[in-house]
């Protein structure tokens, strides 16, 4: 029985899973929309939403905590400065998952995961996003 067991194994080791979620979180923060398999998207949703909830507080302890998870300074800057302020009044539900059919090779279910109220022009240039936000 699976009582009180949270998360998905995704058929990888725990260190692989941790690194994969961190890398996918950086990609989602930079591009604001990524395409992946449905189970990975569902797992990433809970991972990224806890990071955004922490980032709304925006102090040094939160910055260090988030940096220990995703290990990318530019992504942490965007997470705290842009996404944290964008979702300041939203109590949760920062992402949406859109099902996109099945992959050709193995029929794995594919989905897009994106931020609610995302910037459509965000194409992965984190430095430009952070600089534009600090100019205002």
Swiss-Prot record:
PROSITE patterns, alphabetized: RIBOSOMAL_L17 (PS01167)
Keywords: Ribonucleoprotein, Ribosomal protein
GO cellular component assignments: cytosolic large ribosomal subunit
InterPro entries reported for this sequence: Ribosomal_bL17, Ribosomal_bL17_CS, Ribosomal_bL17_sf
Pfam families noted in UniProt: Ribosomal_L17
Molecular function terms, GO-annotated: structural constituent of ribosome
Domain of life: Bacteria
SUPFAM superfamilies (alphabetical): Prokaryotic ribosomal protein L17
Keyword Cytoplasm attributed: no
UniProt keyword Ribosomal protein present: yes
GO BP terms: translation
Record family assignment: Belongs to the bacterial ribosomal protein bL17 family.
Binding partners and assembly: Part of the 50S ribosomal subunit. Contacts protein L32.
Protein name as it appears in the record: Large ribosomal subunit protein bL17
Gene that encodes the chain: rplQ
